[in-house]
């Protein structure tokens, strides 16, 4: 649920605001009710007692919002279900309004408002607490500074220009708020200077809990609908004061009564929509006016006489703002279509149909224009509702299953029969009673005659395609150059003293929209990426905290590539004649063959130019990132991520970087170059007559599969810039490439049909991941294109984040697949064409098949594979989606990727190269073992736990343990949530695991403990399984949510020599580790490494509270400090030095530790002296008082001079004893930071070669 508090000051008194708000609600309700599909019905309007806010007025309304929703929402809902109910309680100066949709049970919009005569300075008027207060976003709306743009701007409503004739108020200056507050503060309003000031405090809670749509719709309502409507409405409240000034509350009530009667007559079809206000060229609803004291319109409407309308007592008003921004470009005829007025009769010059007949036709049908066909079965209205409710119920159940508390209930699917019946009947092509409209685009069918069609009469003509796009109300973006999202200005380079770039992974999101996006706006792209970034951070904070601040996500916006394809296919639809396109009801999308859209899109003459723009935009984003503070000195890995259409552009760009062109044989990876020809210099499929015009060349290309998927020769006006030799290439190297619901394999399959011998172009990246939902109508598998053997193998199922947040450990490597399925890769035993073997017979033969997989088979598969892992990954989606119409799914799936924790957790596991926290870096090349929970998450033992832990991140911690062999080996940990330990995990199960053979051993389960009331557990390893010498990783996992804490236990022999470092005293050159990243003292890391190389055990101590453990360890890891054992204070301590002393004394006296040297600040001298250390063993950096200088060795020349002395002869000696044999040499590991990309690629190749060598030796 998103919570946002709006504070809207206005130069009115509280009582004037009340009159203005109620007047405009009534006025706009009357003006903007057009009948079916757009209007308001007032059901109840009566006083109440002892309700919200005390006594007031209760109103219940029904808003018909069908004409105001964007297409991606309307595609999910039937027309007959597009209503919103409002309940409003108006107990002025408190109001509350709640909006619900009977069809969407998990949707709600709740708005509370308080009105105070101030300037908005009160911080918490709603008395919020806990997570509500933490998650609240405050947004101050200034009616003067916050301007409207484009068609929303009306000069007469601009407070900078408006002057009231009745009151003489206005105009308002930029600093009006400060001026008015100085005038009215502490005075009675209005003042003698006729100045007043009040503020509406509105808190809005939006919830839309359905799979794949929650975040996008909640942000859509907040960012687009609510704020935009409130700004415009309050500007109107000020600019329309000449109409409402002087009215009393009795006048308002009479207006409401008359409006209720008028609306009942209009919405019931009892009068024609001939009122002047109805024909205004804008579409807006009074629902918005109710919550914003006004509503949207394109230009000023004539004042309504004070015969009033209804009272929408709630100052909050309507939530049908959900789609009102789509109406900006609507024309009068589009409004008429949306309200059921038949335009086909007007076009043909015939008489207008009756209103009742128009409403009846508007209620028919389900899929766009096809809905106008007559259906002989029952009532379409009731049945659409039944089907739609069935669908959304299935989505709701799946949404609930993702919550913290899981329920396992049965679903009653008895309605399947009715659904099957509905599907078959709806697809029958009945004739239409109405005469065909004249003047339609039927003549476009003559395009098949290439030489006879005139240019302006072709559906392939650019003028026609642009006209189709403009009639939808969308701006055509194909010709416009891609704009780059520069979220920050160029900043100067970082400080030269910065040791390393904070960003280790850069993710570039190539966003071109879904397959049905004719022209997506930049704001929508930014919203998707913002949602993705927020979801990414939430998952990292919960389970991958070491990656926080090290991953940067940038957007590469791309023009839409489907505009022409959608225009052509919708024109070819059998139902293209039925209605004209409009923004309110995009036609024929349900009738378009979705699978053909990407094929026509890549065949567009503009496709290669769009790829050039995409590459240029990606390069600009990359270079801007390098200039920014977060990217200065960046040398990490770059990950590219493409959505449905963006993946096609990204693939072409990556193939260019490889020196190949996907559309040519020369671009084939590992294929013979002698057969390659340049498509621009000579192409056997090019038209014989080079002088053919563009339309003829397009049709010629349409006759051949190869030319269908490779863009025709560029038009003459830009042929020089589109040659392969001048094609733009990426300026950086991509590590991993993720595709979301991509149709790439279909495009490549069609290319393969033309030349079966040519290999498919391989993108220039290390690994490709093809993520898709099985029910997605455009997504398809990629692996069978590279090897037919994989058509038998199922794609990898991405584990559910709700059950396996750290992954389930399933094998992903290509060689692991060959090993686990040898029967499919054996040349001698062709099981592809044979009978299916039983499990018993297959088990008996597999042992012989594993050794018989030939080295040539493995080598051939690796050569043509796009990485070292599997390529196809199937995502979970609710079963109810299979019952949605195909045209509704692309929008839904496209929105789901940006907020899916399954997708994000999978990406993190791949780019981080680990699925748990790895052991310390070692000098060998062995891979670190990954941790995978052995079982899915369980329900919490205490019911309140899931409620308490919502919206808070885990902050578990455990100090490292040093114990002498033979003594008790006890592990202690504390499990808390929130940055300041606000929530304690009480009475819940925690699993304790340990790795006995580090660094690449197996995790061993030790025990399950239950936390006490303080969130602590204490576990002692039994003597019979106690551990010998060594340093062992320990992981404690919370059973309920799989959050975990990591620590190390060191079992050491007596007289183990160590070196102690105080983190704050000896490492940091600034005061705080918790604020900005502090600088490291020069040479500190080198001194630590010197002692480690001599075999000493390193111990890091700090008096900081253990709640800061994750942040401090991450800081040490970022700066590559060698591994050591860390000790924090237990909670907030008033004596941090005493904690250090007690800790070191315990090690020396009880565990036989010998401290050779100790480093710190002047404050640490007393600590080391109390432990019994000599002056020549204590090294102090920084300023030291004269009284203490004799108690320690002061490093006045810094670490550099000290290190030189240590490295000199006699300066230091190697550690003695057996302890140095068990102490590893390495650093704290941070994913993506410990090894550079080139070395990682070398190790991967080395591993693959080793595996192949093993197979060869076995054979």
Swiss-Prot record:
One of its GO terms (molecular function) is phosphatidic acid transfer activity. It catalyses: a 1,2-diacyl-sn-glycero-3-phospho-(1D-myo-inositol)(in) = a 1,2-diacyl-sn-glycero-3-phospho-(1D-myo-inositol)(out); a 1,2-diacyl-sn-glycero-3-phosphate(in) = a 1,2-diacyl-sn-glycero-3-phosphate(out). The gene is rdgB. Residues 268-378, 427-454, 472-500, 660-692 are annotated as: Disordered. Disruption phenotype: Flies exhibit rapid light-induced retinal degeneration. Residues 318-335 have a biased composition (Acidic residues). Residues 730-913 form the DDHD domain. InterPro entries: DDHD_dom (IPR004177), HAD-like_sf (IPR036412), LNS2/PITP (IPR031315), PI_transfer (IPR001666), PI_transfer_N (IPR055261), START-like_dom_sf (IPR023393). Transmembrane segments: none annotated. Residues 284-293, 347-363, 663-678 have a biased composition (Low complexity). This is Protein retinal degeneration B. The modification Phosphoserine is found at residues 274, 277, 401, 403, 434. Expressed in adult heads, not detected in bodies. One of its GO terms (biological process) is visual perception. Keywords: Calcium, Calcium transport, Ion transport, Phosphoprotein, Sensory transduction, Transport, Vision. It comes from the Eukaryota. Catalyzes the transfer of phosphatidylinositol (PI) and phosphatidic acid (PA) between membranes. May control phosphatidylinositol concentration in transport vesicles from the subrhabdomeric cisternae (SRC) to the rhabdomere. May function as a calcium transporter. GO terms for cellular component: cytoplasm; membrane; plasma membrane; subrhabdomeral cisterna. Belongs to the PtdIns transfer protein family. PI transfer class IIA subfamily. Residues 679-689 have a biased composition (Polar residues).
